[in-house]
Amino acid sequence: MVKLSEDQEHYIKGVWKDVDHKQITAKALERVFVVYPWTTRLFSKLQGLFSANDIGVQQHADKVQRALGEAIDDLKKVEINFQNLSGKHQEIGVDTQNFKLLGQTFMVELALHYKKTFRPKEHAAAYKFFRLVAEALSSNYH
């Protein structure tokens, strides 16, 4: 399991306090749906409307950002705290690679948001955090 340093935890918590959670999450979802179209296969209820401004994307963004907020609140217990969520994702057949792809699109959004201050150190912290989340969400898969 990925472990974040104290500095990385501090950075992740600071970023989460600074950004508009729902907006950045909706943008990351839009980007993952556009760049990796196969990730939309479980979102037929969105009827092909995958823009960050579309209501279905906004609703899913709300769920994702709440889960990320919970992870950030207790970074030492992400895997334990995501056990139920991991099980739900396994039941509906979410490909575990999608979690990694969403993490990548979040990093793109962070780089766009922070432009000059998203340097290698910050990128590494974000990368490790989203890897931690992806591993935790994949933990109940057999």
Swiss-Prot record:
Globin domain boundaries: 3-142
Record: residues binding heme b: 60, 89
Keyword Iron: yes
Gene3D superfamilies in the record: Globins
UniProt tissue specificity: Red blood cells.
Key words, A-Z: Heme, Iron, Metal-binding, Oxygen transport, Transport
Pfam families: Globin
Source taxon at top rank: Eukaryota
Role of this protein: Involved in oxygen transport from gills to the various peripheral tissues.
Protein name: Hemoglobin subunit beta
